[in-house]
């Protein structure tokens, strides 16, 4: 074994330090996907900061994510979207189209927009602790949610429907769904389905 060479993949016009996982992995993925590609992992020594415009006094690190390490949405938000889609004669979609890390239950549709922090009970028994996510920026949506990840088929129905009710003045009218968040406390803790959480609501 040995250390693979460091490479700098480019994604969405950004560069990030990464470790190439070698020729064997590259060949497997190239054969499977039918096009030349490399498998890389982030360089743990490379620290990339999320925008201080949104994180304020918190130095929040991210790696290959678009701009922030965590995306939070809710079951009620995707249910609300699906009700609108079905009412227009379209099929319901899964929340995976929006690629969230955390999906909240027990809140109203788009309450994640009105929450500035989530405290999640992590650990078990005497080791119980709390992880804190700070919601910092609405997530402006590109056309990717229009694509069915199971079939790669694309339809404008999702974007067209979101555009009727999800224009966000905080981002100059951009269409948003979900909130970008950063880890304020509890980095390295494990999140699991069903963990209890508390939220701080804020209203402008």
Predicted ranges, named:
Residues 1-204:
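Metal-cofactor-dependent catalytic cores
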